[in-house]
Curated annotation (Swiss-Prot):
This is Phosphoribosyl-AMP cyclohydrolase. It comes from the Bacteria. Keywords: Amino-acid biosynthesis, Cytoplasm, Histidine biosynthesis, Hydrolase, Magnesium, Metal-binding, Zinc. It comes from Neisseria meningitidis serogroup B (strain ATCC BAA-335 / MC58). It catalyses: 1-(5-phospho-beta-D-ribosyl)-5'-AMP + H2O = 1-(5-phospho-beta-D-ribosyl)-5-[(5-phospho-beta-D-ribosylamino)methylideneamino]imidazole-4-carboxamide. Its main location: cytoplasm. Homodimer.
Amino acid sequence: MDKNLLEAVKFDEKGLVCAIAQDAETKRILMVAWMNAEALQKTVETGFAHYYSRSRQKQWMKGEESGHTQKVRALRLDCDGDAIVMLIAQNGGIACHTGRESCFYKVWRGSAWETADAVLKDEKEIYGSTH
């Protein structure tokens, strides 16, 4: 592990840090996930976003099933060291497992959440079944 890479990062009690994927061109927030030290190291080594799945309890590379990989252009660490923003180039234009550009596709309209973004590709087409 690269000590310089990891020493400024404040991982939580579970060994995780919040990781935000932001489109390098449009600056749109695409998704929020978690990284452990190994996922962060793998991200730096490969140039592609790797995360840690809390539900599956394992590291994974974004796009390993869907092909919608995230090429990392830059990493930014916040002032407290407990959140990372990755400026990325999103392969295929789809970051969300629902087939949308962004996981942030719902907008509050005063009294209800409304879907604001269209599905670009059906989940069944991406994964073979619903994810």
